[in-house]
C-alpha cells in the first residue's frame, strides 16, 4: 500500500500530455519567422572531440567536469554533449553567441 504522506498528483501533472498537445495545437509564435538556425552561422564546425558515444556523465567528466551524478538515468536515447567554456574561465561570460533553438514537439517526444 502507498504511504499516507505521499502527495497525490496535481491537476497539471495528470493532464501534462493534454496541456502539451494543446500548446502545440495553438501554434505559438516561439521564434521570428525569418529565424533559421541552420543559416544563422555556417562558419562554425563542431570539433570532433566533442562527439561523445559513452554515457552523458562519462562524457561530462572527460571534458573537465566533476562531481557526483547521483541516480542519473534516462529512458530516451538523446545525443547529449558536454559543453565547457574555456575562453573566459570563471567569468560566467562568453564572447561567442549561442544560437537559439525553437521548441518543437519533436524535441520533447
Curated annotation (Swiss-Prot):
A cellular component annotation (GO) from this entry: perinuclear region of cytoplasm
Source species, domain of life: Eukaryota
BP-aspect Gene Ontology terms: rhythmic process
Record region (Disordered): 59-109
Major site of localization recorded for this protein: nucleus
Post-translational modification note: Phosphorylated with a circadian rhythmicity, probably by the double-time protein (dbt). Phosphorylation could be implicated in the stability of per monomer and in the formation of heterodimer per-tim.
Compartment(s) where it occurs, according to its Swiss-Prot or TrEMBL record: Nucleus; Cytoplasm, Perinuclear region
Bias-annotated ranges (Low complexity): 69-98
Function: Essential for biological clock functions. Determines the period length of circadian and ultradian rhythms; an increase in PER dosage leads to shortened circadian rhythms and a decrease leads to lengthened circadian rhythms. Essential for the circadian rhythmicity of locomotor activity, eclosion behavior, and for the rhythmic component of the male courtship song that originates in the thoracic nervous system. The biological cycle depends on the rhythmic formation and nuclear localization of the TIM-PER complex. Light induces the degradation of TIM, which promotes elimination of PER.
Name listed for the protein in its UniProt record: Period circadian protein
UniProt source species: Syritta pipiens (Hoverfly)
Taxonomic placement: Eukaryota, Metazoa, Ecdysozoa, Arthropoda, Hexapoda
Amino acid at each position: 500500500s502507498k504511504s499516507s504522506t505521499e502527495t497525490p498528483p496535481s491537476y497539471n501533472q495528470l493532464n501534462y500530455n493534454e496541456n502539451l498537445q494543446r500548446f502545440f495545437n495553438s501554434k505559438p509564435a516561439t521564434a521570428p519567422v525569418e529565424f533559421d538556425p541552420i543559416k544563422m552561422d555556417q562558419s562554425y564546425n563542431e570539433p570532433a572531440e566533442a562527439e561523445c558515444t559513452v554515457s552523458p556523465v562519462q562524457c561530462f567528466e572527460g571534458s573537465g567536469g566533476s562531481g557526483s551524478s547521483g541516480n542519473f538515468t534516462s529512458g530516451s536515447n538523446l545525443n547529449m554533449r558536454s559543453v565547457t567554456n574555456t575562453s573566459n574561465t570563471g567569468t560566467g561570460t562568453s564572447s561567442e553567441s549561442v544560437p537559439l533553438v525553437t521548441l518543437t514537439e519533436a524535441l520533447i517526444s
